[in-house]
């Protein structure tokens, strides 16, 4: 073995070390872990994870799990950071390419539009874990994940993002810049889908709360921190190096992931184990997934995965309203990328660097919201009797967040008069950041608990919907703020969140009844009862 291979085998299971280790485990399992079947073509051995199986990612050590979680979460943060860091380079790019503010902000919109395409394409290829719940891996729905897993999309997407972002840094004109940012955003959709699935691979549902909470904050903290860092970077090193900085950030995370993050997707690991066992003793082994899914054509599987999210979105009222609520919030976050430069750079004469600091209030609110969400999960939800936990048990933080959202937005809108100190409006934007976290996280968990076996499709639909809104909102921000004024322009999305505010209250009180009347929610509940032997 080479020196490099020796070093790799001592690390936290890099990609190169996975296969040999799995073969060794597989060979041991031939004698120590009997499988159902006879080992013939007609009656093959059925390979599934054994109790305390070290090849099962859920049985890996806590340090290793959290190390991998931090890598995939930083990947999401890097992508969303890149989406917004561009937004504070307006003056320099508009001057260099002689373009309007609307055409400039299109560079943000197309990047986020790529996120919308991401779940639609990457989701069927790398389903965000299973749609049959961890309660029974044998019930996994067939997707093309068994062909690609999570590792190959990670390598492909990060490589492509680095290439397109590097190209954008050298763009000779605005058309090239916009096209390359769109392509970078499309490949950036892969980490948004794949990272959450990797966390679900590592942690069983009862232990997943904290990891998913931190992961779910990354898509909102990234867009807020992007302008803060990008503003000063633009001022001192120019907009091209802002794109270059983002390229390096994504590239470093991608390389770290290639080195340290092994394949975590259960069906792929079981298939590899079955192949290794077959080679080891010449008998026939297949994974439990192969046994249960039958011989389905990839085209059939891919088509179903593309259609199901839209069926759930438009046929399930819970999914539609929850997705609309989250989309309005997400769109508003990206609206502020165009609004803040108008409010502080244009009207108060701030430089790009100091203009980016206007996002500090929202950032503080997001961090406080994250702390509150962790406290609520550990101090309230986890102390509930497991037999009495319902999907609605997730919603109390969303009630607080639903109130905080319009308060923060109206306060920000009407404290931006020149006669009022700038610090007031920035401080009062914190409730908006607080509300973003406390509405999004509980609603995501509510949808997962309500739709269990269909959770991946539900979340894919919600992700596409909110990304479209995130792409559209910035396009009319400049006209809206210049025509209506900064006070009323900010009040419009505030009124939208006010209209949506009753949703968490209503679902907390009547959600169980509504779920019984929704076809797929009721079906998911029945499937879970059968899987759990109830």
Curated annotation (Swiss-Prot):
Give the Gene3D superfamilies listed for this entry.
Answer: MFS general substrate transporter like domains
Q: What is the reported phenotype of gene knockout?
A: Abolishes production of trichodimerol and dihydrotrichotetronin in darkness. Also impacts production of paracelsin in a light dependent manner, with decreased paracelsin levels in light, but likely in an indirect way.
User: What's any one GO cellular component for it?
Assistant: plasma membrane
Matching entries from Pfam families are given as:
MFS_1
User: Does Transmembrane helix count among this protein's keywords?
Assistant: yes
* Topological type in the membrane: Multi-pass membrane protein
List where in the cell it is found: Membrane
Q: Indicate where this protein is primarily found.
A: membrane
UniProt keywords (A-Z) are: Glycoprotein, Membrane, Transmembrane, Transmembrane helix, Transport
Gene Ontology molecular function: transmembrane transporter activity
Which residue positions carry a glycan here?
A: 29, 36
Q: Which residues cross the membrane?
A: 66-86, 103-123, 160-180, 182-202, 209-229, 241-261, 318-338, 354-374, 395-415, 424-444, 456-476, 486-506
The answer, when asked if Transmembrane helix is one of the entry's keywords, is yes
What drives induction of this protein's expression? Answer: The promoter contains putative CRE1 binding motifs 5'-SYGGRG-3' and expression is differentially regulated in light and darkness by CRE1. Photoreceptors BLR1 and BLR2 negatively regulate the expression, while ENV1 exerts positive regulation.
Task: Write out the function statement from the record.
Answer: Major facilitator-type transporter; part of the gene cluster that mediates the biosynthesis of sorbicillinoids, a diverse group of yellow secondary metabolites that restrict growth of competing pathogenic fungi but not of bacteria.
Per the record, the similarity remark reads: Belongs to the major facilitator superfamily. Sugar transporter (TC 2.A.1.1) family.
Q: What is this protein called?
A: Major facilitator-type transporter sor6
Species name: Hypocrea jecorina (strain QM6a)
Q: Which gene encodes it?
A: sor6
């Amino acid at each position: 073995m080479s020196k490099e291979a020796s070093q790799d085998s001592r690390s936290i299971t890099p990609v190169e070390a996975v296969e040999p280790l799995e073969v060794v485990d597989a060979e041991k399992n031939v004698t120590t872990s009997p499988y159902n079947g006879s080992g013939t073509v007609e009656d093959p051995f059925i390979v599934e994870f054994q109790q305390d199986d070290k090849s099962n990612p859920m049985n890996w050590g806590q340090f290793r799990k959290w190390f991998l979680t931090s890598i995939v979460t930083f990947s999401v943060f890097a992508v969303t950071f890149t989406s917004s860091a561009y937004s504070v380079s307006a003056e320099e790019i508009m001057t260099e390419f002689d373009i309007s503010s609307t055409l400039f902000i299109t560079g943000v919109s197309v990047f986020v539009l790529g996120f919308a395409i991401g779940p639609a394409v990457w989701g069927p290829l790398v389903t965000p874990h299973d749609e049959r719940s961890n309660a029974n891996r044998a019930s996994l729905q067939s997707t093309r994940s068994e062909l690609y897993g999570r590792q190959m999309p990670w390598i492909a997407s990060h490589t492509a993002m680095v290439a397109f972002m590097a190209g954008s840094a050298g763009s000779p004109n605005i058309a090239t810049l916009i096209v390359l940012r769109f392509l970078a955003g499309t490949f950036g959709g892969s980490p948004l889908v794949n990272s959450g699935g990797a966390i679900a691979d590592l942690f069983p549902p009862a232990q997943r709360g904290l990891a998913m909470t931190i992961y779910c904050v990354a898509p909102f903290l990234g867009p807020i921190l992007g302008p803060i860092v990008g503003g000063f970077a633009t001022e001192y090193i120019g907009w091209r190096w802002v794109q270059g900085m983002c390229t390096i950030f994504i590239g470093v995370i991608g390389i770290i992931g290639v080195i340290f993050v092994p394949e975590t997707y259960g069906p792929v690991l079981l298939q590899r184990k079955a192949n290794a066992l077959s080679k080891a003793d010449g008998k026939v082994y297949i994974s439990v997934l192969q046994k249960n899914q039958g011989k389905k054509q990839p085209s059939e599987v891919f088509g179903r995965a593309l259609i199901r999210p839209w069926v759930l979105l438009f046929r399930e009222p819970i999914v539609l309203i929850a997705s609309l609520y989250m989309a309005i919030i997400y769109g508003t976050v990206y609206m502020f990328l165009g609004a803040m430069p108008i409010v502080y750079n244009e009207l108060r004469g701030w430089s790009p660097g100091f203009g980016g600091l206007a996002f500090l209030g929202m950032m503080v609110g997001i961090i406080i919201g994250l702390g509150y969400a962790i406290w609520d999960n550990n101090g309230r939800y986890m102390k509930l009797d497991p037999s009495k936990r319902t999907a609605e048990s997730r919603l109390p933080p969303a009630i607080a967040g639903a109130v905080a959202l319009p308060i923060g937005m109206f306060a920000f809108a009407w404290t931006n008069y020149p006669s009022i100190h700038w610090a007031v409006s920035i401080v009062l934007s914190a409730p908006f950041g607080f509300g973003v976290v406390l509405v999004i996280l509980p609603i995501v968990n509510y949808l997962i608990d309500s739709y269990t076996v269909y959770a991946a499709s539900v979340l894919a639909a919600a992700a596409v919907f909110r990304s479209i809104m995130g792409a559209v909102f910035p396009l009319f921000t400049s006209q809206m703020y210049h025509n209506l004024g900064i006070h009323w322009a900010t009040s419009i999305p505030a009124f939208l969140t006010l209209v949506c505010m009753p949703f968490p209250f209503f679902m907390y009180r009547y959600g169980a009844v509504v779920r019984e009347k929704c076809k797929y929610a009721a079906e998911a509940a029945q499937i879970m009862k059968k899987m759990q032997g109830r």
